[in-house]
């Protein structure tokens, strides 16, 4: 036995040199099965991935024949053996595996289970990390092979020789220029996270932006409510041309001391009571034009009208606020200032109505939106004494849903338009409650003959 043969027998199986095969033969890599080497067509894969994979197989054949000097029979035996060992010892991978990988695709460097496309090659996590660390820390100049660079690299032997493993990474096509240093890697990771967050925001905005618009049934309901409002709204859209300003001297001379420190100008109060009766009548007519309202018992109709009348009249006045003259137009005909309305009997309630008018001026409400607001106020199921509470609540829900869908259809440019508009319902309910309290005091302070009968009928309990 020669010294060389004795030395060779002492080497591990993976470090033994093999006879040089016929260079014209195409040889397989150790550790890769027939199924892996003869994969199905990659037509369904990305074009770039197909080209890279084809290149990788050509490089593998060159590596096997020129570097490893393997015997063809040896290669076949080791391939089958390694594949069987791999299948026996394989553990189920619970990590993320990209969809572009074939089932059980193997690393082109060591034959372990691949986890993705890393640095232009399909590799396992181990070879990806080894290649990255080698480049980032410039370790390859310090690598050396004890066996003249002829080591076989598979998933068992890959940690035995760093030089041969790195050489194989290069030969199969792993790109050194794609490895980033720590600062660039952190910057890339930050950019990826920012892009993910951006996509999340865009998807959220897209889902929020997709808002339903009225159905055919809701359009019919909207049409009915709008027509009811237009038919009972004095002067319609021509109110500015037809309004008359209350003389400035009226409402400036308080005569009666009202509760809570307020003062009442009886002349102004007399003017307001003259227009209050037709204003109440129009609210009643509006309600009677709604089929849902007419289906309710008469007792419930009366309770709903008494509860919402001041709220609807206040809304109709508020949407006719004129910022230029700083006035509200009552019943479509009488323009009054804040002071005149306050001294005319409403006191602090007038401030709430004017403030509402100022805030609504930026909403640019159309007749349909005003009409639907009135319908929501009318169908308030929490009025004391109602019998058909559930039915009224159902009616209000129908109006609210149609209202919201109509707002989506209108596409207002005010931020959070719908919730802000719903808050105005709360403001109007507060105005109604404050007016009820104010009315009780006014009955005591003002002469009874100044109150119109319909006014007393609606606002008295």
Swiss-Prot record:
Residues 107-181 bind DNA. L-thyroxine binds at residues 282, 331, 435. Binds DNA as a dimer; homodimer and heterodimer with RXRA. Interacts with the coactivators NCOA1/SRC1, NCOA2/GRIP1, NCOA7 and MED1/TRAP220 in a ligand-inducible manner. Interacts with the corepressor NCOR1 in absence of ligand. Interacts with C1D. Interacts with NR2F6; the interaction impairs the binding of the THRB homodimer and THRB:RXRB heterodimer to T3 response elements. Interacts with PRMT2 and THRSP. Interacts with TACC1; this interaction is decreased in the presence of thyroid hormone T3. Keywords: DNA-binding, Metal-binding, Nucleus, Receptor, Transcription, Transcription regulation, Zinc, Zinc-finger. Zn(2+) 2 binds at residues 145, 151, 161, 164. The keyword Cell cycle does not apply. Gene3D superfamilies: Erythroid Transcription Factor GATA-1, subunit A, Retinoid X Receptor. Zn(2+) 1 binds at residues 107, 110, 124, 127. Residues 13-24 have a biased composition (Basic and acidic residues). This is Thyroid hormone receptor beta. One of its GO terms (molecular function) is nuclear receptor activity. It comes from Rattus norvegicus (Rat). 3,3',5-triiodo-L-thyronine 1 binds at residue 435. GO terms for biological process: animal organ morphogenesis; cell differentiation; cellular response to thyroid hormone stimulus; embryonic organ development; female courtship behavior; mRNA transcription by RNA polymerase II; negative regulation of DNA-templated transcription; negative regulation of female receptivity. InterPro entries: NHR-like_dom_sf (IPR035500), Nucl_hrmn_rcpt_lig-bd (IPR000536), Nuclear_hormone_rcpt_NR1 (IPR050234), Nuclear_hrmn_rcpt (IPR001723), ThyrH_rcpt (IPR001728), Znf_hrmn_rcpt (IPR001628), Znf_NHR/GATA (IPR013088). Its main location: nucleus. Residues 1-24 are annotated as: Disordered. Residues 217-461 form the NR LBD domain. Residues 1-106 are annotated as: Modulating. CDD domains: NR_DBD_TR (cd06961), NR_LBD_TR (cd06935). The keyword Nucleus applies. One of its GO terms (cellular component) is nucleus.
């Amino acid at each position: 036995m020669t010294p060389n043969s004795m030395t060779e027998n002492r080497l591990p199986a993976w470090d033994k040199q093999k006879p040089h095969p016929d260079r014209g033969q195409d040889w397989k890599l150790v550790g890769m099965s027939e199924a892996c080497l003869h994969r199905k067509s990659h037509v369904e894969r990305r074009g770039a991935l197909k080209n890279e994979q084809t290149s990788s197989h050509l490089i593998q054949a060159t590596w096997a024949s020129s570097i490893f000097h393997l015997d063809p029979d040896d290669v076949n035996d080791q391939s089958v053996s390694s594949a069987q060992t791999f299948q026996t010892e394989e553990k189920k991978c619970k990590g993320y595996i990209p969809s572009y990988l074939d089932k059980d695709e193997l690393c082109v460097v060591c034959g372990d289970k691949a986890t993705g496309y890393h640095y232009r090659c399909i590799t396992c996590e181990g070879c990806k990390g080894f290649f990255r660390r080698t480049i980032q820390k410039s370790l390859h100049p310090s690598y050396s092979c004890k066996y003249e660079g002829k080591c076989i690299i598979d998933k068992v032997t890959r940690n035995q020789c760093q030089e041969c493993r790195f050489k194989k990474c290069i030969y199969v096509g792993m790109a050194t220029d794609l490895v980033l240093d720590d600062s660039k890697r952190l910057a890339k990771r930050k950019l990826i996270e920012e892009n993910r967050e951006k996509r999340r925001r865009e998807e959220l905005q897209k889902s929020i932006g997709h808002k339903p618009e009225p159905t055919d049934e809701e359009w019919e309901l909207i049409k009915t409510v709008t027509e009811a409002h237009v038919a009972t709204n004095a002067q319609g859209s021509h109110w500015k041309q037809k309004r008359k300003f209350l003389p400035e001297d009226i409402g400036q001379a308080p005569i009666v001391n009202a509760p809570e420190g307020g003062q009442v100008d009886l002349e102004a109060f007399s003017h307001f009571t003259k227009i209050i009766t037709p204003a109440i009548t129009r609210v009643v007519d509006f309600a009677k034009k709604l089929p849902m309202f007419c289906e309710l018992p008469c007792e419930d109709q009366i309770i709903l009208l008494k509860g919402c009348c001041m709220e609807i009249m206040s809304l109709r006045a508020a949407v006719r606020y004129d910022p230029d003259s700083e006035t509200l137009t009552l019943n479509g005909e009488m323009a009054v200032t804040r002071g005149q309305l306050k001294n005319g009997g409403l006191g602090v309630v007038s401030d709430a109505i004017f403030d509402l008018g100022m805030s609504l001026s930026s909403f640019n409400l159309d007749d349909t939106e005003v009409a639907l607001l009135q319908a929501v106020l009318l169908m308030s199921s929490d009025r004391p004494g109602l019998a058909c509470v559930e039915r009224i609540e159902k009616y209000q829900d129908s109006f609210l849903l149609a209202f919201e869908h109509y707002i989506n259809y209108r596409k207002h440019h005010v931020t959070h338009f719908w919730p802000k508009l719903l808050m105005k319902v709360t403001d109007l309910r507060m105005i109604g409650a404050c007016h009820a309290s104010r009315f009780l005091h006014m009955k005591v302070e003002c002469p009874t003959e100044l109150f119109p009968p319909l006014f007393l009928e609606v606002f008295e309990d």
